Amino acid sequence: MPGVYLEESDNFDVALRRFKKQVEKSGILSELKKRQHFEKPSVMRKKKKAAARKRLLKKMRKINMM
């Protein structure tokens, strides 16, 4: 669980920015969006395959550029 400890000299805006960065890094918001609606296992598999294909094509393009 992300948390930020403030000192007396810390600015609130800086602390808020650090907290947002920790939340983003931990993946809480993306997990929340993913779980907001039920997704059938078949749809999850399709998305996973599509993401893998996209990564592979990106890697192939990068290799061909060299």
Curated annotation (Swiss-Prot):
It comes from the Bacteria. Keywords: Ribonucleoprotein, Ribosomal protein. GO terms for molecular function: structural constituent of ribosome. One of its GO terms (biological process) is translation. GO terms for cellular component: ribonucleoprotein complex; ribosome. The keyword DNA-binding does not apply. HAMAP family: Ribosomal_bS21. Belongs to the bacterial ribosomal protein bS21 family. PANTHER family: MITOCHONDRIAL 28S RIBOSOMAL PROTEIN S21, SMALL RIBOSOMAL SUBUNIT PROTEIN BS21. This is Small ribosomal subunit protein bS21. It comes from Solidesulfovibrio magneticus (strain ATCC 700980 / DSM 13731 / RS-1). The gene is rpsU.
